[in-house]
Structures are given as structure tokens and as C-alpha cells.
From Swiss-Prot:
Presence of the UniProt keyword NADP in the record: yes
Database matches in HAMAP family: THF_DHG_CYH (MF_01576)
Pathway field: One-carbon metabolism; tetrahydrofolate interconversion
SUPFAM superfamilies xref list: Aminoacid dehydrogenase-like, N-terminal domain (SSF53223), NAD(P)-binding Rossmann-fold domains (SSF51735)
Identification of the protein by name: Bifunctional protein FolD
GO CC field: cytosol
Amino acid sequence: MTQLIDGFRIAAGICESIATSVAHLRKNNGLVPSLRVIIVGENPASQVYVRSKQKKAESLGIDAETIALPKDTSEVELIRLVNSLNDDTSINAILVQLPLPPHINPTRIIESIDSKKDVDCFHPENVGRLALSKDALLKPCTPAGSLYLIKSALGDNLSGMDAVVIGRSNIVGKPMAMLLLHENCTITLTHSKTRNIQEKTRQADIVISAVGIPHFVKKDFIKPGATVIDVGMNKVDGKLVGDVDFEDVLQKVKFITPVPRGVGPMTIAFLMLNTVITTCLQNKLEHQEVIGTVIQKL
């Protein structure tokens, strides 16, 4: 029987732990984690995401502020702002909402963020730490949230399982593969140039799709009893749908995340978690004592 992995419910539980951690920092250390989100331009989807992040942060007791800049903001001006936030010791976490306008190089912006305040975990130092060790303190939000969902369904021991990641982006695909490799899974990372993707996915115990194509994954991609994590968020006829054709694969899988209420809430929860971790790092506090129950699954 197919079971839904309810990311909304699981994320709510994580956020309860984070709220407790924030209260702990305030009471015992006199600290309030602070997050600054920068958005450039008026991309409607980005505005929705930023509002969701700020609302969630505020609900957990985090000091959150969105800095909205006009779309003609120059790259130099944006880097200057990031540097000012880097230098401000009262700011613990910095996020620059992507995508940026075409005239701004996102790589330069990401590299300008202090790696200890990089809650997206996109900075090359944090990417390198993730590649080197399972014990990297900061992990990218969507892949880390997806891994948490996988473990919630299958248990903490994923050793020996075959996993296929569809999509090789720096944001989801590559770090997702790295996290699963640290769990001793055997990884196949597929992409737009991969031949016969279905042949790869049909061998997998775990399939993670982050390709951004509505209903790309059909039942002929999936072996019976597989676990499917749908990272895709696509608009079709005004409705939010995933990369996975949910109804088509539903009777074939053992576990699956819905869209919405799957990976999306986990991404925001792990952004909040990273904000608490960066606060602990900058203040030389033992983060595991503050948020140990969440960290155990990572």
C-alpha cells in the first residue's frame, strides 16, 4: 500500500524544535538569530518564496528582514550590500534570492557572502565541506530536507540502496547526490543528456526528481516498491504540480511525496535550521546542544 510522505507535517515538527532552540538561545545566551533576505527585482515567484521565508522565520522568533532592491541594481551595489551584512556582527544569516536579473552574475554574489552566514549553503567553501564530509555543519536546504523525508520513510540506515537523482543543478541535483553518497547509497546522477533515463530509474530503490518538467516521471520510470521524492514545483493551468505524474505512479510506489505539502515546506524548515546553526557558529556555541534532535537524522 502506497504511503504519502507528508512534508508539511514533518516540517511542522522540525519547526517546533527550532522554535524551542530559538527560545533557548534568547533565554540562556541573550541571542536572537537574525536573517536577512535580499531580493532584486519583482519576480512574482521569488516574492512569494521570500514572503513565506520571512513569515516562517518570524513565527519561530527569528529576527527576519527582507531587503527589496530595484531590478536595475548593479552587481557592484549588490556586493556592497552583502559586504555590509557580512561585517554586521548582529546579522547571523544572509540569503540572496535567486534568480537574479541577467546583468548580475549569481556566482560572484554567492561567493561574496560570508561562508559562515551562507544559509543556502551555496558558497564554494560550504560546497567543498559537504563534498568532503557527512559532518559538514551547513547543508543545502532542499537536499537536506529531502534526505530527512527519505529517512522518515525508510529509516536512518540507507546503506547499500540504489538511488537515482534526476537533474544535476548546483542547488539540488549535485548536493542531493553527495548527501546520499555519504549515506552509503549507490548513486546515479542523470540529466538532460542521459540516454534511456528509464533504464536507470527502474533499478532504483530511491528516485529523486529535480528536473523542472511537469509530470516527467511516469510509472514506467519506477520499479515496484520504490520511494519517490518529487522536488519539482511547476505551474500547469494555474495549479502547482511536480515532476512526477502523481496519479500515474501512485499504485506502483511504496512511498511518495506529494506536491504541494512535500519537499517545499522542508526547504523552508531547513533554512530556519541553518539560521540557528550559523548563529551558534558565530557565537562559538555547541549547536548540537541547541538543536540536537533535528541534527540526528542528518
